[in-house]
Design a protein with these regions (language model features):
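Proline-centered loop/turn at the N-terminus of a beta-strand
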Residues: 72-74
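Catalytic core of DAGKc-family lipid kinases
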Residues: 83-167
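Short glycine/serine/threonine-rich phosphate/pyrophosphate-binding segments
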Residues: 60-64, 172
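Short glycine-rich anion-binding loops that position phosphate/pyrophosphate groups of nucleotides
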Residues: 58-60, 83
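Divalent-cation-assisted or electrostatically stabilized phosphate/pyrophosphate-binding catalytic cores
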Residues: 79
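N-terminal glycine-rich "phosphate-gripper" loop used for MgATP/nucleotide binding
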Residues: 54-58, 66-67
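ATP/NTP phosphate-donor binding region
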Residues: 1-51, 55, 91-108, 119-132
């Protein structure tokens, strides 16, 4: 891989400093292009980049995955947060090894399923309803003052089941 986008959560401590250091290291290793972005993944395609490296936490990686869904671009997360469950590097000492592997194409892409959820009320989609993309799960819950909600669950347009509950969590396997 030679063309990288660093997608940075600037609210994380030392994020700018880390992004600049990683950019410099990738260029030293032979990267042809390393851009830094912190706002949006809109318009980013596989024509421009070979890989997106997120700097933040799991939330940053999930936000990038949602924005890049369908692009075919691989994501590699560097954890600057607390959990780092989805990231490939959580400690400063791990970052050089990860960058080397990316430059040398010495890695395995783990395909992750994403969910697309939509809420339909009383058989009709209202203008305020939209689709949500999720990497892990979609949580739908009632308003705090309301009673239980009646959920009819469909998967790919086929009825699955119905539930009466305070909320429901639909997750990837």
């Amino acid at each position: 891989m030679k063309r990288f986008l660093l997608f940075v959560n600037r609210r994380k401590e030392r994020a700018d400093e880390k992004a600049k250091a990683i950019r410099e290291q990738l260029l030293r290793l032979g990267a042809q292009r390393v851009d830094i972005e912190d706002q949006s993944t809109q318009g980013i395609t596989a024509l421009d980049y070979d890989c997106v490296v997120t700097l933040g936490g799991d939330g940053t990686l999930i936000r990038a995955a949602r924005g890049l869904a369908g692009s075919g671009l691989p994501l590699a997360g560097i954890n600057l947060g607390h959990m780092g469950y989805l990231t490939v590097a959580s400690k400063d000492a791990e970052i050089p090894r990860v960058l080397d592997k990316l430059i040398l194409d010495d890695f395995t892409v783990e395909e992750r399923m994403m969910l697309c959820g939509r809420i339909v009320r009383n058989g009709h989609e209202s203008p305020r309803d939209r689709e949500w993309l999720a990497l892990n799960e979609i949580v739908v819950s009632r308003k705090s003052s309301a009673g239980p909600v009646h959920f009819c669950i469909y998967v790919n347009g086929a009825f699955l089941n119905e539930y009466k509950a305070d909320g429901i969590i639909i997750s990837t396997p």
